[in-house]
Amino acid sequence: MAFAQSVDKDPAAIVELGGAAGWSLKNGGSSFGADAAVEVTPIENWLELEAGVTPLFSRHHSTEWNTDLLFKKPWTLSKKAELMAGVGPEWVHTREPGMRANSIAGEAVLDFMFWPGGKHKFGWFLEPGYDYNFARGHERSFGISGGLLIAIP
């Protein structure tokens, strides 16, 4: 005799799509752009990995592409809310009129994830963060991204 089992499987990955904004703590400039990332959970309740890319555009005709890999510790706040704290390296490619540069930075974030249905299929996120660039000038910035979460089964 076979019994039906209800198995709540976690998604294989979660895609984050949204918008982003950044503010320089050194010179006060701001930039805005899109945000895309994929998150996986190699160690349940202990480690989530997020790889993402964010192109940011400023009024001064400069573009900054940030590509990061974050190591996050997750906490489940309720069936519909999660919090993660993470750190990781970031590659920064900057294009300004007459100049191009590549540099390495460090990033720290808090990631708030909200799942309205409780089934973790679609939701939304809000992720404030701090960046420290190790290149000459040691740029520091605060950023925030937010948008849609899509679970990949």
Language model: regions and residue ranges:
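Short glycine/serine/threonine-biased micro-segments
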Residues: 16, 20, 84-86, 127, ...
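Gram-negative (and chloroplast) outer-membrane scaffold detector with strong preference
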Residues: 37-122
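Predominantly the C-terminal beta-signal and adjacent terminal strand-loop region
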Residues: 9-10, 46-49, 61, 111-153
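Solvent-exposed, flexible loop/coil residues
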Residues: 27-29, 81, 126
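Transmembrane beta-barrel architecture of outer-membrane proteins
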Residues: 14-16, 31-33, 64-68, 103-107, ...
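Short glycine/proline- and aromatic-enriched beta-strand/turn motifs that initiate or cap beta-hairpins
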Residues: 2-56, 141, 149-153
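Short amphipathic beta-strand and strand-loop transition segments with alternating hydrophobic
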Residues: 19-23, 91, 110, 130
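Outer-membrane beta-barrel domain signature
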Residues: 6-10, 21-28, 56-62, 95-101, ...
